[in-house]
Amino acid sequence: MEHNINTDFSEELAVRSLAAIAQPHRLRVFRALVVAGERGLTPGALAEQLSVAPSSLSFHLKELTYSGLASSEARGRNLIYRANFAQMNGLLAYLTQHCCQGAACEAAEEGCVAC
């Protein structure tokens, strides 16, 4: 799967994305999804891995999905959640767009991808 950087990132989308990960449990969930990469994780696996109650996890996954930082896909009777690397890279690009104030940055052109 190709990991493009979302170059059409708006301030509103940046705020929504940052708000989604500005909560400790959601940040931990998002980081676990990033580590899982393309294979993703089921809510059950996430709940067990992070020791989070399923009802609480459901709320956090809904918020991450709404923000665009995560997506879900039905696989049989399970939902598989994945980090949206294009959205994550778009957020990073938006935040660092003017980081070097005109000088060349050493940031990787391709951004972050699944391990």
Task: Go through each PLM region and give its residues.
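Short, hydrophobic-biased segments on the C-terminal half of alpha helices
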Residues: L61-K62
